[in-house]
From Swiss-Prot:
Gene responsible for this protein: Aldh5a1
Activity-regulation annotation: Redox-regulated. Inhibited under oxydizing conditions.
The protein, known as: Succinate-semialdehyde dehydrogenase, mitochondrial
Modified residues annotated as N6-acetyllysine in this record: 114, 253, 353, 399
UniProt-listed Enzyme Commission number(s): 1.2.1.24
Record localization: Mitochondrion
Function: Catalyzes one step in the degradation of the inhibitory neurotransmitter gamma-aminobutyric acid (GABA).
Length: 523
């Protein structure tokens, strides 16, 4: 059930796909790669390990290993880029910018569309790579690839809708012209939880605007970014427009600093933790670079007495357990009004037991894969133990899964209080803590008692209450009687310390455009 949520949401009401471009994989005898504990048919042409700079695959003296979080098996080794490689990538992007910004919007649109076509044509292969490196169930990975590709499709269309303006001034012999121009080279730093979609959501907008990019993918999941490079190259994206420089954790700090401070970089877009975002903002401040940030969340999920409990439970399942709770918009704090509290908790527990099956993402029927690594498991374990020590009740789950490794049981906690770590910190795991409340004002106050504000959800059948709460929640995105809110057509972003700017939608391309005013006199 849970694995279908993402796929269902992205496929709903979609028109038939345009006939795709040429398939990357060979019709027969294509080379495959396998690893212990994984499938024997990962496509070798897409599973690249070198950096991709200036349209070329470049090895580095050092490499780092990438592991399957489900089996612990080694997927392979990837180029470990450092400061020299980062500067070379920025230079390649800068050199390509002068020509890329000058090509027609129709041509940019066409190239992005070809890239989209290749993603759709190779969607099954790309999904397997996501499951192998992130652990998420294959159906969720398939949903992510569609979501990821749709950003390229969307921004291929938005590229042709960048409009300026003409202003009639108070002086009759003057006119004001407003131009929109690409900002320049953009540094793109992406997370591991959506290793494909977080790239195309940024890169699609950047390339559509006429910018060039340097992508630093998360060290846990570099293969998806490199697979996208292979397809971008095949689609005809010019050399230097899309560059990828993977690096290990030991080099992430120095590479990130280069991408934020190099004078040839004009724009930074980052998705990740609030703590890391603050560091990057500090680096960017010295040269006053344009910055977009999508940072941490602590999403409240409020269920009022007037809510349809069954619908609320279905929404809670979708919002909480997608990608094992490892999403920035997943519900972190469940606030349930006293009148329906017991009914909600009972039905929520039943749905979890019935619908969630923990296992390897490649296994049929798996709905929850592993957490990304041991450190993530330890954090979830810490939050659960802290809650229990402070009086919370474990309704279901509450410990590491019997499979061992990076697996953790889907967990539901009741009798939760506001001082517990699972309420004050982002858990980023399959834990649903439930707080009981009495009045609407109390729920809104608890929901807003955080220094972050990415997403919020609530269930109610009271129209007046819906308007009040939607306006009062201090978040960038609100789901009303809906647990899945992400859509390529809608703006994604937060308030407070959850970030700066918006991604996706018609607003996403503006993050990569400068507004220039031209005064035209002597008329």
């Amino acid at each position: 059930m849970a694995t279908c949520f993402l796929l269902r949401n992205f496929c709903a009401a979609r028109p038939a796909l345009r006939p795709p471009g040429r398939l990357l994989r060979e019709p027969a005898g294509a080379q495959r790669r396998s690893y212990v504990g994984g499938p024997a048919d990962l496509h070798a042409d897409l599973l690249r390990g070198d950096s991709f700079v200036g349209g070329r695959w470049l090895p580095t003296p050092a490499t780092f290993p990438v592991y399957d979080p489900a089996s612990g098996a080694k997927l392979g080794t990837v180029a470990d880029c450092g400061v020299p490689e980062a500067r070379a990538a920025v230079r390649a992007a800068y050199d390509a910018f002068s020509s890329w910004k000058e090509i027609s919007v129709k041509e940019r649109s066409s190239l992005l569309r070809k890239w989209y076509d290749l993603m759709i044509q190779n969607k099954d292969e790309l999904a397997k790579i996501i499951t192998a490196e992130s652990g998420k169930p294959l159906k969720e990975a398939q949903g992510e690839i569609l979501y990821s590709a749709f950003f390229l499709e969307w921004f291929s269309e938005e590229a042709r809708r960048v409009y300026g303006d003409i202003i009639y001034t108070s002086a009759k012999d003057k006119r004001g012209l407003v131009l929109k121009q690409p900002v320049g080279v953009a540094s793109i730093i992406t997370p591991w939880n959506f290793p494909s979609a977080m790239i195309t959501r940024k890169v699609g907008a950047a390339l559509a605007a006429g910018c060039t990019v340097v992508v630093k993918p998360a060290e846990d999941t570099p293969y998806s970014a490199l697979a996208l490079a292979q397809l971008a190259n095949q689609a005809g994206i010019p050399p230097g427009v899309y560059n990828v420089i993977p690096c290990s954790r030991t080099k992430a700090k120095e590479v990130g600093e280069v991408l934020c401070t190099d004078p040839l970089v004009s724009k930074i877009s980052f998705t990740g933790s609030t703590a890391t975002g603050k560091i990057l903002l500090h680096h960017a401040a010295n040269s006053v670079k344009r910055v977009s940030m999508e940072l941490g969340g602590l999403a409240p999920f409020i269920v009022f007495d007037s809510a349809n409990v069954d619908q609320a439970v279905a929404g809670a399942m979708a919002s909480k357990f997608r990608n094992a709770g490892q999403t920035c918009v997943c519900s972190n704090r469940f606030l349930v009004q006293r009148g329906i509290h017991d009914s909600f908790v009972t039905k929520f527990a039943e749905a979890m037991k019935k619908s969630l099956r923990v296992g390897n993402g490649f296994e049929e029927g798996t709905t929850q894969g592993p957490l990304i690594n041991e450190k993530a498991v330890e954090k979830v374990e810490k939050h659960v133990n802290d809650a229990v020590a402070k009086g919370a009740t474990v309704v279901t789950g509450g410990k590491r899964h019997q499979s061992g490794g990076n697996f953790f049981e889907p967990t539901l906690l009741s009798n939760v209080t506001r001082d517990m770590l699972c309420i004050t910190e982002e858990t980023f795991g399959p834990v649903a803590p439930v707080i009981k409340f009495d009045k609407e004002e109390e729920a809104v106050a608890i929901a807003n008692a955080a220094d972050v504000g990415l997403a919020g959800y609530f269930y109610s059948q009271d129209p007046a209450q819906i308007w009040r709460v939607a306006e009062q929640l201090e978040v960038g995105m609100v789901g009303v009687n809906e647990g899945l809110i992400s859509s390529v057509e809608c703006p994604f972003g937060g308030v407070k310390q959850s970030g700066l700017g918006r991604e996706g939608s018609k607003y996403g391309i503006d993050e990569y455009l400068e507004v220039k005013y031209v005064c035209y006199g002597g008329l």
